[in-house]
Amino acid sequence: MAKAKFERNKPHCNIGTIGHVDHGKTSLTAAITKILAETGGATFTAYDQIDKAPEEKARGITISTAHVEYETQNRHYAHVDCPGHADYVKNMITGAAQMDGAILVVSAADGPMPQTREHILLARQVGVPALVVFLNKCDMVDDPELLELVELEVRELLSKYEFPGDKIPIIKGSALAALEDSDKKLGHDAILELMRNVDEYIPQPERPIDQPFLMPVEDVFSISGRGTVVTGRVERGVIKVGEEIEIVGIRPTQKTTVTGVEMFRKLLDQGQAGDNIGALLRGTKREDVERGQVLCKPGSVKPHTKFKAEAYILTKEEGGRHTPFFTNYRPQFYFRTTDVTGVVHLPEGTEMVMPGDNIAMEVHLIVPIAMEEKLRFAIREGGRTVGAGVVASIIE
């Protein structure tokens, strides 16, 4: 049978399965593709095909991630599933697979476990907007009261990490029953019920092009007789010739007007998310702008020096540090296009951080950088990556 061509006319959404090891994340991923394949919305991908996930590199870190795609009545989905716990931590922190929402898989037989808690915390820290819960292996639990107890536990845990625990949809079912066609209610029907909830409960992400304009500065040239041209890839939004923008980061914020946009040496009337452009800036001197700043819609992004972050520190085998670090550690933080030195303050009770740890920390940069929550960065020492992080909240 020929592979069905995915229609791109449906809104797109990125999701993933998260949860404790062996609670059934990969089985559920396989089950979703199986059930949706019945209506032509997917190609069935078996468990063992998903489980041997290829390795990818993101921000200098190797991560194993499996990708499947499928569609429901309403949306087209790209779905990520990771084989190991460390891969989830790295994936969520580096944003290698951006998640607009996630399906938290909890085994009804075991209830919430340590990684269930850790994945919920990570989802909160890295800014995953919404979770839907699949209570898996319900065919192994005969006592309905026990199921209710597990559901209550999951809701309490979600609320503890500031997700709306009492509102989040929890679907009871069995991925195995769906894969083996053994119990229609817990298998087939539960998967469809899950996808209906994912469709309705996970908000449709705003497309990059609809967000306020932002472009990281990669290079600055001065063109005699024309002025200063700044090049970079537009991260989001649209910039039109004649619009006012701000130059933010490193030094005091400046306002200027874009008097020209070019791409591949051709003049355009606008540049948009994904385009590599050169922007001609009115009355701006070559020395007024530098790599590491951003051009943005006025007032949309502010420069900051202090923030809380969630970070993953590479192991020695991954090319990271061989030794732990302590509070007042001073590496470089690579934001978008440049390194800035910063000082790390560890939370109370954390003496040191070992290679391979993930950690919440406070960072004070020596110069301000245009930043907002969810912005990713690399932690570097002399140009080599020793960690990755994400801005969890801004202090000042």
From Swiss-Prot:
Region annotation (G1) ranges: 19-26
Region (G2): 60-64
Main EC class the enzyme belongs to: hydrolase
GO molecular function, one term: GTP binding
Sequence segments annotated as region (G5): 174-176
GO CC terms of this entry: cytosol
Stretch list, region G3: 81-84
Catalytically driven reaction(s): GTP + H2O = GDP + phosphate + H(+)
UniProt-annotated binding residues for Mg(2+): T26
Keyword line: Cytoplasm, Elongation factor, GTP-binding, Hydrolase, Magnesium, Metal-binding, Nucleotide-binding, Protein biosynthesis
The protein's name in its UniProt record: Elongation factor Tu
Keyword 4Fe-4S attached: no
Subunit structure: Monomer.
Pfam hit, one: GTP_EFTU
Listed InterPro entries: EF-Tu_GTP-bd, EF-Tu_GTPase, EFTu-like_2, EFTU_2, G_TR_CS, P-loop_NTPase, Small_GTP-bd, T_Tr_GTP-bd_dom
Enzyme Commission number(s): 3.6.5.3
Family: Belongs to the TRAFAC class translation factor GTPase superfamily. Classic translation factor GTPase family. EF-Tu/EF-1A subfamily.
Natural source organism: Bradyrhizobium sp. (strain ORS 278)
Cellular localisation: Cytoplasm
Major subcellular site: cytoplasm
Occurrences of domain tr-type G (ranges): 10-206
Location of the region described as G4 in the Swiss-Prot/TrEMBL record: 136-139
UniProt entry tagged with the keyword Metal-binding: yes
Tree of life domain: Bacteria
